[in-house]
Design a protein with these regions (language model features):
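C-terminal segments of large proteins
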Residues: 1-179
Length: 179
């Protein structure tokens, strides 16, 4: 494609996520429900009724940023200072502009914001992982975060080399960085 300069704006919204952890679906989602949502949760309090874990369907909770842009003047925007004030959670970035024919163009991007020095998990999920580096050389240390929306969860790590178990350990799930 050919670059076209345009003006528009983008807004960032914090999304309202479920207030509890749901168990992963054990069967396909029903296309029709025989129970009301309330009756279902009374019987199956930890199971998904509909699309509660689908971030693309979560409501917007709060607009946290609204900025104009002009790609004729600037194409990169550093928002690191603004992100420092964001609370951990899932956000959607919505960009709006018009093309050279006056047609509306909308783009969406979903991001997760978290703080490695804070114990607040950004999503209500059974297991949340962050690996800043996906590959390492022998002897090199790798940092990672393994967290859970449940309390007192342990993870089992087993390291193999050429099909043989080299080591095994358990760690408590936490938003603190591990090696």
């Amino acid at each position: 494609g050919v670059k076209e300069n345009t003006k528009g704006n983008f807004a960032i919204y914090k999304l309202k996520q479920p207030n509890k952890v749901y168990r992963s679906r054990l069967w396909q989602q029903a296309d029709r429900h025989s129970l009301t949502k309330e009756d279902y949760y009374t019987t199956f309090p930890n199971d998904l009724y509909a699309d509660e874990n689908n971030k693309y369907k979560w409501e917007k909770e709060t607009k946290v940023l609204d900025k104009a842009f002009d790609t004729g003047l600037k194409t990169d925007y550093d928002l690191s200072a603004e992100f420092k004030s964001f609370k951990p959670g899932v956000y959607v970035i919505e960009a709006n502009c018009k093309d050279k024919f006056g047609e509306d163009i909308k783009a969406f991007s979903y991001i997760t914001v978290f703080n490695k020095n804070n114990n607040e998990i950004p999503e209500q999920t059974a297991d949340w992982f962050y690996y800043p580096k996906t590959m390492a050389e022998p002897g090199e240390k790798v940092n990672y975060i393994l967290a859970s929306g449940y309390s007192n969860v342990n993870y089992l790590f087993e390291f193999e080399h050429q099909g043989k178990l080299v080591s095994s350990k358990t760690e408590l799930a936490s938003m603190k960085s591990n090696e």
